[in-house]
From Swiss-Prot:
Family annotation (Pfam families): CoaE
Compartments, record wording: Endoplasmic reticulum; Mitochondrion; Nucleus
Entry superkingdom: Eukaryota
UniProt-recorded name of the protein: Dephospho-CoA kinase CAB5
Amino acid sequence: MLVVGLTGGIACGKSTVSRRLRDKYKLPIVDADKIARQVVEPGQNAYDQIVLYFKDKIPNLLLEDGHLNREALGKWVFSHKEDLQALNGITHPAIRYAMFKEIGYYYLKGYRMCVLDVPLLFEGNLDSICGVTVSVICTQELQLERLMTRNPELSEEDAKNRLNSQMSTEERMARSDYILQNNSTLVDLYEQIESVVKKIQPSKLRTVLEYFPPFGAVSASSIVMSRLLMKKLQNKKSSAV
């Protein structure tokens, strides 16, 4: 099964692409945002760790019903980089475990492809398990405009803090196999999606062969090794600049 890593900066249109892949092409979606909400529900281990770490920093961390005040938590961590790293350190292991379980489920169901929809695909090194990576991008001006329209409660400073906390568009493009430019119309975006799907669709023969241990192991190993090599080359290039 081909795992397609889908990522993109905030308010670039990744969710639009994910819905199109699900509705038009019937691809199963492993949604990291959805999983991230589930693992921080009251009673979950990640929830307890977040409360312990942030309760003295964010007075309104919890809502009346005991759930996390996601707006207050987000505003805080996007203004405090070290705390954003701490939050990611708490949530990422739980999110990874849940994602791997879901990917395994779709593999056993016999799907030819599944989409791993992750905002921090490269930051979390999850691209290493993907056969193909796709990034959705747009201009920073359009990104800011869309973010403030989608989240009117954010000030311009808060919105810019969220954008600046993420990987740059240039780095994301350099690490992606395919780029979807979302600066124009929805029709244009859909045409780009159609083109990418046609290029990456695995054959039925390959899908069947991957259920045989030798072929499956070689296929998986080649993906991981190629991703690690690509990352190593990119790190060398960055160091040389």
